[in-house]
């Protein structure tokens, strides 16, 4: 789901970068710009194309992994994905709540497994809380501020107070902020899944690495 969401916004960024490059080419043709001035715009368009290709590959790989998983569990027929990830909870689970659940699980485990679960629970909780904080920040102040800047840029452009370059740059910035927010949201739900697994006695090989934006961050082994 996250990979498909990211793919859409990578297309938006490429469209804006390509529009800027085409405008720059016209300015070079009529003599208003030099090729040196065009070069950064050309690089931005090339980078946007590369990012789109990465996003396309990530989306295809995520789809293939999902089909494989559904096939292994006998659910390959008739499943459908939502258009977007669910919203993160306003408040994360508390330390007291999680400790109570963790202790209940450990009381049923052999001593060696109980010790491993204690360490895993601490790590899983820390990643969970960090992922929640990052997702809140990226979807809260950061994204809202970027949306405000975009709206103001459009108004200034319509009033001829901003250039088309300013507008195209802001479209790219807005799309990138959205991609980052989707990545943080995805990371939270992976961290939450890892935590729930540990609280059932599971032992993931690793936890999600926070900060990826491409939709292809692997879940812990065993999911």
Feature locations, PLM:
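Short segments within alpha-helical structural elements
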Residues: 2, 47-72, 145-201
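Soluble, cytosolic/nucleoplasmic coiled-coil alpha-helices used as oligomeric scaffolds and tethers
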Residues: 13, 19-20, 27, 34, ...
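Acidic, low-complexity, intrinsically disordered peripheral segments
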Residues: 74, 114-117, 121, 180-223
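Short, highly charged low-complexity linear segments
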Residues: 79-85, 147, 166, 206-216
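Short, electropositive, low-hydrophobicity segments enriched in small/polar residues
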Residues: 35, 75, 163-164, 205
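Sec/SRP-type N-terminal targeting helices
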Residues: 11, 36, 40, 104-151, ...
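Amphipathic, soluble alpha/beta structural segments
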Residues: 95, 127, 131-134, 138, ...
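Periplasmic alpha-helical coiled-coil/stalk elements that build and connect Gram-negative outer-membrane
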Residues: 1-103, 131, 173-174
């Amino acid at each position: 789901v996250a990979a498909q969401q990211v793919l859409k916004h990578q297309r938006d960024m490429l469209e804006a970068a390509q529009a800027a490059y085409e405008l720059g080419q016209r300015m070079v043709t009529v003599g208003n710009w030099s090729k040196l001035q065009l070069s950064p715009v050309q690089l931005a368009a090339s980078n946007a194309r590369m990012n789109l290709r990465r996003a396309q590959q990530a989306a295809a790989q995520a789809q293939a992994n999902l089909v494989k998983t559904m096939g292994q569990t006998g659910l390959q027929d008739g499943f459908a994905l939502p258009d977007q990830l669910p919203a993160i909870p306003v408040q994360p689970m508390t330390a007291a709540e999680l400790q109570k659940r963790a202790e209940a699980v450990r009381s049923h485990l052999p001593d060696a497994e109980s010790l491993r679960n204690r360490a895993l629970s601490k790590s899983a909780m820390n990643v969970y809380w960090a992922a929640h904080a990052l997702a809140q920040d990226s979807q809260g102040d950061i994204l809202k501020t970027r949306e405000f800047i975009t709206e103001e840029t459009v108004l200034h452009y319509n009033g001829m107070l901003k250039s088309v370059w300013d507008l195209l740059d802001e479209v790219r910035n807005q799309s990138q902020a959205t991609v980052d927010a989707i990545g943080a949201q995805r990371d939270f739900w992976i961290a939450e899944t890892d935590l729930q697994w540990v609280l059932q006695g599971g032992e993931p090989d690793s936890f999600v690495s926070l900060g990826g934006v491409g939709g292809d961050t692997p879940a812990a082994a065993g999911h």
